[in-house]
Design a protein with these regions (language model features):
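Charged, low-complexity intrinsically disordered segments
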Residues: 10, 33, 40, 68-70, ...
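Short, surface-exposed beta-strand/loop "edge" segments at domain boundaries and coil↔beta transitions
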Residues: 9-10, 17, 21, 70-78, ...
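Amphipathic alpha-helical packing elements
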Residues: 2-57
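Extended boundary segments
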Residues: 59-113
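Short, conserved turn/kink motifs that form compact alpha/beta structural patches or helix kinks used as
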Residues: 91-92, 96-149
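Non-Sec secretion/translocation targeting segments of pathogen effectors
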Residues: 180-185
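Short, compact, well-ordered microdomains
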Residues: 31, 39-53, 138-173
């Protein structure tokens, strides 16, 4: 719930499942991943009180994904490569005019989760479970991810699934993906 992967009502199903488990190796507090204090409030005051506590422990962060515009006629020497290839190609920072904005959304995170943890999660999410209306490629080296933390925007060059290098980036120079063609009736 803290990561936004399920609705709060999912907890009821988890409690039911715990009661029917053959193994009794975990108490309900451990099974739900709650602290003793959270569990006591859950028992004494119910779901609403627990939801309020958990809601106070999470935050929504805006992010954008920028990917290189790749065509059949142009070659980008650092496409799908790490930051050192970008520098070998003569760039100090990713050339924003060669990129397009492919996605902008919010991600739910536990408060206190650092940028690298958020980026690692986005890398997995945008490789394993692409949103239905996502029109970019899976996240890969040479992509740029923007994270917004309370109005402060930070940009990261994707080196690989665990390595994201802070970079300067000018998103207003990026191209927008063309709107999808309307279906003919």
């Amino acid at each position: 719930y803290l990561c936004g992967k399920c609705d709060f009502t999912y907890i009821d199903g988890c409690v039911e499942l715990w009661h029917t488990r053959a193994e009794k190796d975990l108490d309900l507090t451990e099974y739900l991943g709650l602290t003793k204090e959270e569990y006591q409030i859950f028992l004494a005051q119910g779901n609403r009180a627990l939801k309020d506590i958990l809601d106070s422990q999470r935050v929504f962060r805006r992010f954008c994904i920028y990917q290189l515009c790749l065509g059949e006629t142009q070659t980008v020497p650092f496409a799908f490569k790490q930051l050192d290839a970008l520098r070998k190609a003569g760039y100090e920072q990713p050339p924003a005019a060669a990129y397009q904005t492919v996605w902008s959304a919010e991600v739910c995170c536990p408060k206190g989760q650092n940028d690298m943890e958020v980026l690692g999660r986005l890398f997995l999410d945008f490789n394993e479970h692409l949103p239905e209306d996502y029109r970019g490629r899976p996240l890969a080296p040479s992509d740029v991810v923007e994270l917004d933390c309370q109005g402060k925007r930070t940009y990261f060059y994707v080196n690989d699934c665990r390595d994201f290098a802070p970079v300067r980036f000018s998103p207003f120079l990026c191209k927008r993906l063309p709107e999808p063609a309307q279906k003919q009736e």
